[in-house]
Amino acid sequence: GKILGIFPEGGITSTILTEAKPGAVFIASKANTKILPVSISGGEYAWDNMLKGNSSIITINIGKSFGPLEIKGSKEEKMNKLESYSRELMCRIAALLPDNKHGDFTGDKTIKKYRKEDGFRFFK
């Protein structure tokens, strides 16, 4: 009944999305719980702005939860499922961000599907 926040990329700060490590998906599958995709943008400049005495605009978007995830089978099947679910997680996060922030997931067709599910629309 508690909440655990994990940065699936491994805690790095980047202006665009990078590949996820399998830890977030692995923990969620072992806990038999759902994953709630969340995007945070604008934070990459927060410290520099704060040190200069300026404020930052940080945007947090929350998508629809998915799971629980079942990861069973041989070692190879489990690794494939971890990789697949990790990619799904990152595409769901990408759906919450403007297109220029998709990074490693640019052009993935599932982003549009997840964006529609979440009801998000970004303007240029």
Listing of model-derived features with the role each one plays in the protein:
Residues 1-124:
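Non-catalytic C-terminal accessory region of glycerolipid acyltransferases
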